[in-house]
């Protein structure tokens, strides 16, 4: 009988231990698992691979940069394409592949057609891959040559010998002109990514991507190195690693949203004929060096990278459940490839003393990144990785800090073994000499051929990468590898009409007021200029040079703003501007206030140096020069400034290494007296974070335009004259303005969060009504959309808490926080018992939300939604356009319950914390009881453990009653919060143990008598 009771008690304990955690009302948060789709054209790619020669296989791994535009049969590039079977080329204006001009689109289309035709030509008799003297080749390791091998089945796949494999023809086209857009004439002058980010509308990124995809595909471009997915969480004005306007912004969520939208646009515009390669994986946002010059080292762990740098790449590697035959889930904005950057990390795997090699060259770091679930699924679906240019100075200095040698074979092999599928051989030599780089390219390809023949592991790695490459090319050409499919219509390319209206619309939405506030602007800068007022425009006069022999041109023409102002508001328009009272000068003219300039100005469109062009014989200067010793200052700038009513400075980036920018900053610092009692406006046509707080204080107004495209110059003038409002908002943090992106993207404290429940009335129908709700039913709650302080939906991952209040019992349960997605948080709660419950949502610092009142009675139930009046929290006014406040009905907000005020809001009667604490408390109580019984009572071992088990069971029974909301438990919850479960369970356990001891003692006494 005793053993029976012991077994029964043990069963009860086990049962309640399993059931107890289920008593807590845990939210249902399910995530649908999307199966990884098979890469499109995978089987066709495998069949082609089986029929390819060694030379064909190896050559496909390489994209090269080349010099000139000579593609005749005897040219260097023809030799590389026909005899070395290279897989692709990267076009650059700096390498004289084409000359920008009105006919550039047609000339580029002709060039790509001729390059693809070269790929269709048969090679000269192939040079057999011979091993180096130190390698022994066995017959079984020799791959069949394409000219002599017969197509044999491999793994059940019939081999197909390809006669033509289209070339990858790649391009950088980031927007905002040179140097990061190769084609600067004949196409739509797209803005910078930062300008698009300032609109906070991903739709604009999709529009820009669609325009770019449509135009580039008509030129025969099939690989786009972009968009830039780096996150500028902390701007670095003037630092070598400063990204300037090349990024979408500083918030990982929004960079990902814009990046995915841009990818969708390119895919749609090109009809899926362009492979989009996001860069610079895993992110250069924290870099303090220019990667092309020196490999940066960033002190971040992999976990830290996942929070910021990697988040946008996760957003563009989302694979849909059912991709089409021509794209890898393009509807999700998934990129086709990732450009792997040369960046190192300290503490990558947690050890702060250990540093990785550059990720592009480090197999361990590369595989750790590719093994992340978000990236692994994309890779499994056919995602291709491209190395960044392997010949840049930063890579050379990594191997030889003195930059005196360059081992081309080693660099290429280590980049390939690290995991890159495609090797980009850009600047592939110690100097800028094209003959030297050409020799390195040929030697490297021959070295890879030898390794393929002699090393089975290496050969398997080549086949794996080549399968991805072939599948991607098949996708671009819908499985049709015929020379005709790779040709484009040259006449159609010549007739491309720029989409200027679309760019103008983006410009209108991006112009941002930085200082003062929108409320104070009319008082200090009246847009109603009188005809008798004088205006002086002073423009940064840096020049851009696209190649060493190209004629330089100004980034912003000196009279550009003046011409726009006269066109819009001159005598032939509104008559607000008198041509005789408008004058234009340059930053160099400001030397008249400081003395002559003796430095040589470096022409840069941004703070990052221009890429190095190739030379056929001579070393070419990598940065163009605009002036030597400065010419005498324009005679009249002092008089013009003295007589001016409005002075407008047109800025690019203010890199102090550029003399023109230094002159402007010196002018603000040393001659602020010349600006006294004048309206002074600065327009930032580059990144807007270069001025410090003191410099900004000397300005009447400060606007950001982010781009020097003509549409943005016009939009800035329209805002200046009051014709259009500054509709944009800063996408990056600026310390000088006390503008924190983290604060601005947090929930607006003055909003009322919409809250709905499934199948209930909406706020517009907020009247009580009968509803069939019963105890045990579930309610699907939905809070949102939740907006940030700029009026946009909050980033994904913003925590939201649903609060269940029981007015009668004066108890409140705060559920575990859930994260938003697209500005909305969802949770399922269970109606636990009869009575009244009020449900609301909190997203700190936003406290006000709709209130859902649920009343469950014996015969009927009711539910209603009430919209309370928000309680504004005093916050500093942001420096951007004000956020429209949501309207609210005049219903007083619910008062806090006593339980909430005394406990700060309990987590609930059956929270996970309470369960864990109860579990350990009961274990400790049972152990203590067992030890105490052994020490103080003469009870045998069996009876002793029986008492412990009964006390343990009693504790769990009380816990279940507490979690289920048994009558009277509310008082315990109000007094102890989530500690109540443990307190009550331990008390019950001790009480049962004490009673058992008393009973056992009486039995012992009776036995003694």
Specify the residue positions occupied by each region the protein language model found:
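Preference for extracellular/luminal or secreted protein segments
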Residues: 29-83, 184, 399-800, 805-807, ...
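N-terminal hydrophobic targeting/anchoring segments and the immediately downstream early-domain regions
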Residues: 29-185, 513-516, 644, 939-940
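Conserved, mostly hydrophobic/aromatic
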Residues: 53, 89, 172, 201, ...
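Hydrophobic core
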Residues: 13-21, 391, 914-916, 923, ...
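Hydrophobic faces of well-ordered beta-strands that scaffold small-molecule active sites
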Residues: 59-66, 87-91, 167-175, 223-227, ...
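Short acidic, glycine-rich surface-loop motifs adjacent to enzyme active sites
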Residues: 81-104, 225, 237, 241, ...
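Short, aromatic- and glycine-rich surface loops/edge beta-strands on solvent-exposed regions
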Residues: 834-846
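Second-shell residues forming the walls of enzyme active-site clefts
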Residues: 53, 73, 104-110, 114, ...
């Amino acid at each position: 009988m005793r053993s029976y009771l012991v077994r029964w008690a043990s069963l009860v304990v086990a049962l309640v231990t399993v059931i107890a955690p289920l008593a807590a009302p845990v939210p249902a948060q399910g995530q649908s698992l999307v199966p990884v789709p098979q890469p499109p054209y995978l089987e066709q790619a495998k069949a082609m691979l089986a029929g390819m020669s060694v030379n064909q296989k190896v050559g496909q791994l390489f994209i090269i940069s080349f010099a000139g535009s000579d593609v005749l049969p005897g040219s260097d590039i023809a030799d590389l394409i026909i005899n070395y079977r290279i897989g692709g080329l990267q076009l650059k204006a700096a390498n004289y592949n084409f000359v920008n001009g009105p006919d550039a689109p047609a000339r580029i289309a002709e060039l790509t057609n001729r390059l693809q035709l070269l790929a269709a030509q048969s090679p000269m008799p192939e040079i057999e891959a011979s091993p180096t003297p130190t390698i022994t080749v066995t017959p079984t390791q020799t791959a069949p040559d394409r000219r002599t091998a017969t197509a044999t089945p491999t793994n059940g796949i019939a081999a197909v010998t390809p006669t033509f494999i289209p070339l990858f023809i790649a391009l950088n086209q980031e927007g905002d002109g040179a140097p990061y857009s190769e084609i600067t004439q004949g196409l739509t002058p797209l803005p910078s990514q930062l300008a698009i980010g300032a609109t906070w509308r991903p739709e604009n990124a999709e529009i820009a991507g669609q325009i770019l995809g449509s135009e580039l595909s008509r030129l025969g471009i099939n690989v786009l190195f972009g968009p830039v997915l780096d996150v500028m969480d902390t701007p670095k004005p003037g630092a070598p690693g400063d990204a300037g306007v090349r990024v979408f912004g500083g918030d990982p969520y929004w960079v990902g949203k814009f990046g995915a939208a841009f990818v969708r646009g390119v895919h749609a515009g090109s009809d899926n004929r362009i492979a989009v390669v996001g860069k610079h994986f895993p992110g250069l946002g924290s870099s303090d060096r220019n990667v092309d010059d020196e490999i940066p080292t960033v002190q971040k762990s992999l976990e830290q990278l996942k929070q910021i740098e990697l988040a946008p790449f996760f957003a563009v590697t989302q694979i849909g459940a059912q991709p089409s035959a021509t794209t890898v889930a393009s509807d999700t904005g998934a990129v086709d490839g990732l450009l792997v950057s040369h960046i190192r990390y300290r503490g990558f795997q947690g050890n702060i003393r250990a540093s990785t090699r550059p990720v592009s060259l480090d197999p361990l770091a590369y595989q750790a990144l590719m093994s992340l679930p978000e990236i692994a699924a994309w890779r499994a679906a056919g995602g291709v990785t491209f190395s960044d240019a392997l010949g840049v100075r930063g890579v050379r200095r990594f191997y030889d800090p003195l930059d005196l040698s360059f081992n081309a074979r080693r660099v290429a092999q280590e980049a390939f073994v690290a995991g890159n599928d495609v090797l980009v051989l850009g600047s592939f030599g110690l100097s800028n000499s094209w003959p030297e780089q050409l020799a390195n390219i040929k030697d490297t390809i021959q070295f890879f051929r030898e390794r393929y023949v002699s090393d089975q592991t290496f050969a398997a790695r080549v086949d794996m990468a080549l399968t991805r490459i072939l599948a991607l090319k098949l996708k671009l050409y819908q499985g049709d590898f015929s020379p005709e499919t790779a040709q484009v219509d040259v006449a159609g390319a010549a007739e491309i009409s720029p989409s200027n209206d679309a760019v103008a619309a983006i410009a209108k939405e991006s112009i941002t007021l930085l200082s003062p506030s929108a409320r104070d602007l009319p008082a200090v800068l009246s847009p109603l200029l009188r005809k008798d007022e004088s205006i002086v425009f002073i423009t940064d006069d840096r020049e851009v040079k696209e190649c060493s022999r190209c004629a330089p041109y100004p980034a912003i023409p000196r009279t550009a703003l003046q011409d726009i102002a006269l066109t819009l508001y001159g005598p032939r328009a509104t008559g607000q501007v008198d041509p005789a009272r408008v004058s234009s000068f340059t930053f160099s003219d400001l030397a008249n206030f400081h003395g002559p300039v003796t430095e040589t100005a470096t022409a840069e469109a941004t703070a990052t140096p221009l890429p190095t062009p190739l030379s056929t014989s001579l070393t070419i200067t990598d940065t163009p020069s605009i002036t030597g010793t400065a010419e005498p200052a324009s005679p009249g700038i002092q008089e013009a400034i003295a007589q001016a009513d409005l002075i407008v400075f047109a800025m690019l980036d203010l890199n102090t290494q550029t003399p023109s920018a230094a002159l402007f900053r010196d002018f603000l610092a040393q001659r602020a007296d010349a600006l006294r009692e004048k309206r002074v406006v600065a327009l930032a046509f580059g990144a807007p974070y270069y001025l410090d707080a003191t410099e900004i204080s000397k300005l009447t107004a400060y606007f950001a335009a982010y781009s020097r495209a003509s549409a943005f110059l016009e939009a800035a003038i329209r805002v200046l004259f009051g014709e259009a409002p500054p509709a944009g908002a800063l996408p990056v943090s600026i310390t000088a303005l006390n503008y924190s992106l983290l604060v601005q993207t947090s929930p607006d404290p003055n909003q009322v969060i919409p809250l709905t429940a499934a199948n209930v009335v909406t706020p517009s129908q907020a009247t009580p009504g009968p509803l069939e709700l019963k105890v045990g039913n579930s309610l699907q709650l939905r809070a949102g959309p939740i907006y940030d302080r700029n009026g946009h939906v909050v980033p994904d991952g913003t925590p939201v808490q649903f609060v269940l209040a029981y007015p009668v019992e004066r108890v409140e349960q705060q559920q575990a926080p859930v994260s938003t997605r697209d500005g909305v948080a969802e949770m399922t709660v269970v109606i636990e018992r009869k009575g009244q419950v009020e449900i609301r949502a909190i997203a700190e610092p936003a406290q006000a939300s709709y209130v859902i009142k649920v009343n469950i009675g014996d015969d009927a139930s009711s539910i209603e939604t009430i919209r309370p009046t928000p309680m504004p929290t005093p916050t500093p006014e942001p420096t951007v356009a004000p956020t429209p406040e949501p309207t609210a009905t005049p219903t007083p907000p619910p008062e806090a319950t006593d339980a909430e005020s005394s406990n700060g809001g309990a987590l609930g009667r059956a929270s996970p914390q309470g369960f864990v604490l109860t579990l350990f408390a009961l274990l400790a109580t049972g152990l203590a009881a067992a030890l105490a019984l052994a020490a103080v009572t003469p009870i045998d071992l069996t009876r002793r453990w029986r008492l412990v088990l009964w006390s343990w069971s009693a504790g769990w029974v009380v816990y279940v009653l507490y979690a289920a909301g048994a009558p009277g438990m509310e008082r315990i919850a109000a007094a102890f919060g989530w500690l109540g479960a443990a307190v009550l369970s331990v008390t019950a356990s001790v009480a049962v143990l004490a009673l058992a001891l008393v009973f056992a003692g009486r039995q012992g006494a009776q036995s003694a008598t």
